[in-house]
Amino acid sequence: MALFRKLFYRKPPDGLLEICDRVFVFDCCFSTDSWEEENYKVYMAGVVNQLQEHFPEASSLVFNFREVGTRSVMADVLSEHGLTIMDYPRHYEGCSLLPVEVMHHFLRSSESWLSLGPNNLLLMHCESGAWPVLAFMLAALLIYRKQYSGESKTLDMIYKQAPRELLRLFSPLNPIPSQLRYLQYVSRRNLVSEWPPLDRALTMDCVILRFIPDVSGQGGFRPMFRIYGQDPFFVDDKKPKLLYTTPKKGKHLRVYKQAECELVKIDINCHVQGDIVIECLSLNDDMEREVMMFRVVFNTAFIRSNILMLNRDEVDTLWHIKEFPKGFRVELLFSDMDAASSVDLMNFSSLEEKDGLPIEVFSKVHEFFNQVDWVDQTDATRNMFQQLAIANAVQEGLDGNSSPRLQGLSPKSIHDIMKHAAIENSAKFKLSSMSEVETIDTPEKPPTDSVKKFIAEDVHSVLQINNQEQNASEDATKLLHQESPSLKLVHHSATVKPLVDDSKSPENAEENFPKSPSAHDGKAISFSPPTPSPPHPVRPQLAQAGAPPPPPPLPAAASKPSEQLQHSVVQATEPLSQGNSWMSLAGSTFQTVPNEKNLITLPPTPPLASTSHASPEPSSKTTNSLLLSPQASPATPTNPSKTVSVDFFGAATSPHLGASDNVASNLGQPARSPPPISNSDKKPALPRPPPPPPPPPMQHSTVTKVPPPPPPAPPAPPTPIVHTSSPPPPPPPPPPPAPPTPQSNGISAMKSSPPAPPAPPRLPTHSASPPPPTAPPPPPLGQTRAPSAPPPPPPKLGTKLSPSGPNVPPTPALPTGPLSSGKGRMLRVNLKNSPAKKLKPYHWLKLTRAVNGSLWAETQMSSEASKAPDIDMTELESLFSASAPEQAGKSRLDSSRGPKPEKVQLIEHRRAYNCEIMLSKVKVPLQDLTNSVLNLEESALDADQVENLIKFCPTREEMELLKGYTGDKDKLGKCELFFLEMMKVPRVETKLRVFSFKMQFTSQISELRNSLGVVNSAAEQVKNSEKFKRIMQTILSLGNALNQGTARGAAVGFKLDSLPKLSETRARNNRMTLMHYLCKILAEKIPEVLDFTKELSSLEPATKIQLKFLAEEMQAINKGLEKVVQELSLSENDGPISHNFNKILKEFLHYAEAEVRSLASLYSGVGRNVDGLILYFGEDPAKCPFEQVVSTLLNFVRLFNRAHEENGKQLEAEAKKNAAEKEKPKTGGLDTEIKKPLNEEVKEEKTKTSGLGKEMSDRLKERTAP
């Protein structure tokens, strides 16, 4: 079919460029030259005449994009030739795109016209400055007809047809991000039952900017927002209006610094519906000059979860702007209009001395805390004025955003008005007048029957101009000019609504077109108002940012020189009838085959020998895959759609050929290509000592007859080299002839060594005696030679192996025969049992010299050698062999015959090895694995396994390599088979990511909801705690008592940073702090507030949460949901393989959207409560983050509890002390009473004792007297 089209392809006439089948663009649209009116008429007439000669049976329909209200010279020329013209606006509120309803009208009109007959042609034309809109609409048409896929690729392909600077000349801002957003609306139309969907009326709550840019050059900016769109309160009026602008009065405009705030939240509270344009500008210090920061265009019908998150690549910015940081992000938070709530504002009256203690309570506080500085050395009066200014700014924000027409209306009455207006709008399904369509008579040539039918049908859906609404719009415009003199806006009353109904089949398309009345013969249909709208200059920020457009190619009237700068907008209205049925040509096969000169064929694969000298270390597995690739990878044909683009547009770039790149990349790896086995390549890889005698011819013939190596089998274990060494002083004895068996093994190993380099080959036995080595490891294989004696004939075979010697990794040689006196004498080996296979190594630390007097020096003596027992090698082999004996014998047999292929490895060895490890952990058959992915079965796999599968998805190069393999698939490795199985699933990596998102969605939603609930609960608890409020009021009274008579006194509030200073301010005796005194006063006066911490239970868990991480989680969920929507749209075209996948994913999407919408509402509400909490303490939400607030409050709670406990302990200690002091007087009186009788008794005893002594002395005297 492609060859047939190529043979019968007809070059389009001069002056036209063919975009796709039967769709042409005038080449004057790609030029910036100015045309004289007469020259332009001659040029256009010549193009039309050539077109009619080229396609004599064809009927043409022209779509023209121009400035509304201006004269079109092209319409005058084309109408003379009987061509039908349909005019569309050139922009929407200065943006290079059109509303969704106008897009739908254009797409259905184009599709219906092309489906009416094979001879119908579609011509596209744009006047000066409208090229960006024309390119956008052409890309939408190609995606709508499913001729191209991929929004970015299609749009870029269209823009390449014109010089690149043309887009920047006509658009000072880069419109591509918003255009791609609207193209996604078109490509994903199959996800909704009705397209375009009904408009949603939403309330834009706020705009959050993260990582703010530096626009002013001083580390910050002063943002200002303007919002344009349809007013949802006036459903019948679809003209775009200025819905919101940031007031320039008061404190609404403030400067945000990057060093002060990472996040900026600006409350909007604006009702929006339909196509919305949001402009963010930065106002200079003079409050006059505006600089455009970015612009966002979207439709509210496609806001699925009431939140729109955009990064710096998804907003329209000035060309080459560099002020935006990498992490810049815009978050637009919405809510349903009936569920919108305002931001909780701070009420400064709550900080008055109402419920707190009066100031008289602290009359004695001066004697404790006089001359103590516990407040920052700043002006307290200035702080108070800043707090009052914040309150005024908040109040003015509410007053500035209120609409005058809504004053006095309750929310319920507003909702009833909107509901009633929506019912009336749905009933008004017909336009009021058909006489206001701008037409141009062409009496020369009547149109064809198909044109008459198309005109008669399309008249019901063209742009209508309602003259009765013009006065009302002019009054509204004057009112807007009076409100904001700096804004110069023009609101046109032009409206449009598509005519098409998708309910009827293409077969009835011809019957559904009614006969055209003769009054419409030769008339052109215009989508612009008959009277030009009043001109207005370009917005100042756009005029300054971009270069002025060049003179238009079409001449304009001399009396209206400024009409070229008008930005008029045409908006859609309701259709006239629903009885129309136009064909849908989705999946059309109209394609054109490129010429032979544009076809790119794959070059022939170069011979393998051309890369054989690149590296001395080959890889047999990779060599095998390369040997198979010339036969298994033929030239891959180019994609028809890609070659069409080359032929149609003459682009200098060629289609990408994955197969060619793959072959080139493989052949460009010299380390993976072994040298071919030929006479010319038999050179030694390293220089050698004196060469041996020339080898016999038998060896030469043996080597040259080796065929190209197939995939290798396990190589045979090498025969250890036997060294019969002697001490260095005596000369070496003559070498004996080598045994015949090792010789034959050496020959066989030499034959098999080139194709099997991974293992060392078997070498012949050397009987030469080298001197003692000076290094621990022995020389590498292939380089083992006797330097002190010429090599005997058997080593000639061994030296012949030197060309492949470097390819063999160096391994230590194991001795196998009886050794003479010297090193290693303790090892006595029976020569009959010399090992025939490799043994397991003993990893010891080898000594190279025996120190005199050591064990090993004594071992070198002959008398000690007999003490070591003989080693039975048979038993040693049976116990410590590296492989089974039968396997070793089989390996020797296989090596003598040549390696046999076992597994073909096409994927890089390390990646294949890691992939097999991953598959061993999955433990699911490959067939069941793909079925689990397509059926989204969470029972078969867990989240970690799915993440591992994503890491090992085949790349494009690996897919091309596997597609080119034509051998036996049973010989492929496990990794290759896994890749082949995964390749059966279209876009397997995207499906796995969607699967992973689905598996983790419930847990992510639950965790984020819990975290948001903790933050919300903490904010509510702090604001609603009456006990905490009375404590804060008491602190205010305490501070005013301390600062009475100073500049810090008479405060109405204090900042949160003042709370920690309660513990830092100490009394004169240093035994008490202000926090202790506060607890003491509260315990004495209002003890019921001391347990306020029980009301703040969520405060501590809230300190462990950062709002930044919550925002990132919310963005990840939204991005994942977007990927689900995108994959669901693409998988609709996969066929039966994705049928069950689509069904399950649609159910999940319906559930996930409801969950995300609910979560977004909670996210928005938490943001409002957080701001309300910060404002509750008189702080600025832009400078005082939530984390700082809760951490300060938690610290205050802990210090308060500690001080209260210390006060309790102090009171207990004082009570014990007082009790002890009271017990002291009683104890002293008891002691005196006890001591008094004791003294009397002592005296009596003394008296008695003295009396007895006197009596005894008298008796003695009497006896002794003579």
From Swiss-Prot:
Keywords: Hydrolase, Protein phosphatase. The active site is at C126. The keyword Zinc-finger does not apply. Residues 889-902, 1210-1248, 1255-1266 have a biased composition (Basic and acidic residues). Residues 617-644 have a biased composition (Polar residues). The keyword Manganese does not apply. Residues 829-1226 form the FH2 domain. Residues 9-193 form the Phosphatase tensin-type domain. Residues 529-538, 686-698, 706-742, 754-781, 806-815 have a biased composition (Pro residues). Residues 497-568, 597-825, 881-902, 1210-1266 are annotated as: Disordered. Residues 199-337 form the C2 tensin-type domain. SMART domains: FH2 (SM00498), PTEN_C2 (SM01326). GO terms for molecular function: phosphoprotein phosphatase activity. Disulfide bonds: none annotated. It comes from the Eukaryota. Belongs to the formin-like family. Class-II subfamily. This is Formin-like protein 13.
